């Protein structure tokens, strides 16, 4: 990740720190799509923003946009090592995935009913997939 983009990611995460979790507007899926749009000048977030507001409708949308297909379609490749800017996909029991953004050795994400963005240790044994933006690099 270029230093300028890395700086921008850090500043953006700091801004997100105190924004409340709101399903469909500021959650685990909107987080990585919003960052993708900022980093790459796209408008992917609009396809889900505000279109679900409870767990049932979130799962319905997750089925329409499976992340294991979304990432490759938007220029990402699966990798094994972690770098700033990567997105960690964690599959949950309820048939949907969460996305966390890697920055400074931690995964940053928005969980259900959290007060804002939270930091997660990457050394746990939680099954996950790492995606790195490959277009243009």
Predicted regions and their residues:
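N-terminal capping segments
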Residues: 1-61
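Intrinsically disordered, low-complexity N-terminal regions enriched in serine/proline/glycine
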Residues: 48-51, 99, 127-132
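...with weaker cross-activation on analogous glycine-rich loops/strands in unrelated enzymes
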Residues: 54-119
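Glycine- and charge-enriched low-complexity intrinsically disordered segments
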Residues: 118-137
């Amino acid at each position: 990740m270029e230093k300028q983009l890395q700086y921008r990611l850090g500043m953006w995460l700091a801004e997100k720190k105190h924004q409340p979790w709101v399903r469909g507007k500021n959650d685990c899926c909107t987080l990585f799509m919003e960052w993708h749009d900022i980093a790459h000048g796209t408008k992917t977030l609009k396809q889900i923003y505000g279109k679900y507001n409870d767990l049932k409708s979130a799962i319905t949308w997750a089925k329409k946009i499976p992340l294991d297909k979304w990432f490759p379609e938007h220029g990402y490749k699966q990798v094994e090592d972690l770098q700033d800017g990567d997105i960690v996909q964690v599959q949950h029991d309820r048939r949907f995935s969460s996305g966390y953004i890697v920055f400074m050795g931690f995964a940053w994400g928005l969980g259900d009913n959290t007060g804002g963005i939270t930091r997660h240790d990457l050394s746990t044994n939680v099954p996950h997939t790492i995606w790195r933006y490959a277009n243009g690099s």
